[in-house]
A protein has these predicted regions:
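Residue-level signature of mid-helix packing/kink "hotspots" within the transmembrane helices
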Residues: 77-85, 169-170
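Helix-loop boundary and gating motifs at the non-cytosolic
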Residues: 29-70
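Structural signature of the two symmetry-related core transmembrane helices
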Residues: 98-112
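Symmetry-related core transmembrane helices of the 12-TM Major Facilitator Superfamily/SLC fold
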Residues: 189-204
Length: 238
């Protein structure tokens, strides 16, 4: 019996080591993953914080009507939609994390741009740049989080990542309206959003990503920017 125990012990030990190695390899909660979750939450929190108060800001400071307010605010969404088809191509062609951080930095700085926008025209320009950077940083964040998580837990990891946006969406507008109703100035609100993105940018810069060789450049074609097979899924989501 004792000899049998000695004979099977190495096998059990090897199985235990192998099981531990697999668990470590498939580990989802890592410092990098936590940093990217925080970066995404803080980015969306700054975004949603201003969504309900921007109409009041445009109305009070620029004396704009409701239709003009709608057009100005929609410039952001239109700009984000226009850049998204090219975002994937850029992220595959160039280094992903630097491009992600660059887009995050531009997105962050536009909150400061709102503070110095002395005319409606300048505000619209900042709004368009803000939308372009938002389209880039959101796609870049999705790419980075996929790169740093184990493929076996990709669905779970993306679910938690998307939850950060939902959480920010649930508390950001409420927080913004609460501050506005409490008499907080618009400049202070912009600073809060700016500060949120500063913290998010710091978290994003701490994420360590594996090296991904750039995709070989191919001739420019429509399928590089629009995946026709994905059109039905996109229409159903719309």
């Amino acid at each position: 019996d004792q000899s049998g125990q000695r004979r099977w012990f190495p096998i059990n030990a090897n199985r235990s080591i192998e099981r531990s190695f697999i668990m470590a390899k498939d580990r989802l909660i890592t410092p990098g993953y936590c940093f990217i979750l925080a970066a995404n939450f803080l980015l969306y929190f700054g975004f949603w914080l201003l969504i309900p108060v921007l109409p009041f800001y445009l109305s009070e400071f620029f004396q704009t009507g409701n239709s003009t307010i709608g057009i100005v605010l929609s410039c952001y969404t239109v700009a984000a939609l226009c850049i998204r088809p090219f975002s994937g191509y850029l992220l595959d062609t160039f280094a992903r994390k630097p491009l992600y951080l660059f887009a995050y930095f531009i997105f962050m700085m536009m909150f400061g741009g709102y503070l110095i926008a002395g005319s409606l025209t300048l505000f619209i320009i900042f709004r368009i740049i803000h939308g372009v950077s938002f389209g880039m940083v959101t796609v870049g964040g999705n790419t980075v989080v996929i790169d740093i998580m184990p493929s076996s837990r990709r669905g779970e990891g993306l679910g938690y990542y998307g939850l950060t946006n939902n959480t920010a969406m649930s508390i950001g507008p409420m927080f913004g309206l609460f501050l506005h109703d409490a008499g907080v100035s618009f400049a202070t609100l912009f600073c809060y959003a700016f500060g949120s993105c500063i913290l998010g940018f710091l978290c994003a810069s701490l994420v360590k990503t594996p090296y991904k060789p750039p995709v070989k450049r191919e001739p420019i074609s429509l399928d590089r920017f629009i995946l026709l097979k994905g059109m039905p899924a996109g229409l159903s989501l719309l």
